[in-house]
């Protein structure tokens, strides 16, 4: 991430701690410089497996969850298995019931759920995982975002992060770039959270760093 990037402090904060890394130079469009520095790909979407690794490491979870397989699609050969199991064991992360999606059949006798480690993570999912791992589960009654009412399944976690300045939204009156839907202003001109939108690597780094390492950003309360 270049210095002018608004995400630089967060990416740098996590990279210096060995929590996240990049991609070796030399791929198409990513030439090597004299130092052969890697590329971070800040605009690339982040997956559920990658999120599990970053959040688990940021929370300092280092226990061995054991050999038990918790998801049909995450066996011991999966590169994210340890981190996924650490979060799942604590109830910070979950999966999808087998048999609902056509390509996720139930396999007897365990009929385990599916994790979908390669699927893109959403802003709502990331908020839940980060807030849970950080122990931010205080009850709330206020509504910060137009599209996150108290009935939202992610309401508690989003409000816990938003109330501390760890996560923000988008000013009303615009258009959601991923869905194309308009985001009208309500009577209080509240921002929109866009909880179903996919998260980029840079956005995930910012939310994670704000929550677990707030000293990386002096503006965070």
Task: Report each predicted region and the residues it spans.
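Feature responds to low-complexity, polar/acidic, surface-exposed segments characteristic
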Residues: 1-6, 21-49, 57-83, 93-124, ...
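Short, compositionally biased
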Residues: 9-17
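Generic structural marker for isolated residues within well-ordered, non-membrane alpha-helices
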Residues: 11, 52, 127
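Phosphate/pyrophosphate-binding loop motifs in nucleotide- or prenyl diphosphate-using proteins
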Residues: 18, 91, 165
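C-terminal functional regions that serve as terminal interaction/effector modules
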Residues: 167-168, 207
């Amino acid at each position: 991430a270049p210095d002018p990037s608004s995400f630089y402090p967060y990416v740098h904060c996590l990279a210096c701690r060995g929590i996240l890394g990049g991609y070796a130079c030399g791929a198409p469009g990513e030439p090597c410089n004299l130092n052969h520095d890697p590329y971070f790909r800040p605009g690339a979407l982040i997956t559920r497996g990658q999120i599990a690794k970053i959040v688990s490491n940021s929370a300092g979870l280092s226990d061995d969850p054991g050999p038990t397989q918790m998801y049909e699609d995450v066996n011991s050969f999966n590169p994210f298995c340890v981190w996924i199991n650490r979060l799942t064991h604590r109830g910070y992360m979950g999966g999808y019931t087998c048999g609902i999606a056509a390509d996720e059949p139930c396999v007897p006798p365990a009929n385990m759920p599916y994790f979908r480690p390669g699927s893109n993570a959403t802003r709502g999912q990331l908020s839940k995982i980060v807030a849970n791992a950080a122990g931010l589960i205080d009850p709330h009654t206020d509504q910060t975002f137009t599209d996150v009412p108290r009935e939202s399944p992610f309401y508690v976690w989003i409000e816990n992060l938003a109330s501390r300045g760890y996560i923000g939204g988008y000013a009303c009156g615009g258009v959601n770039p991923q869905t194309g839907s308009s985001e009208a202003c309500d009577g209080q001109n509240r921002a929109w959270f866009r909880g179903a939108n996919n998260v980029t690597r840079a956005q995930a780094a910012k939310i994670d760093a704000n929550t677990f390492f707030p000293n990386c950003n002096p503006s965070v309360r």
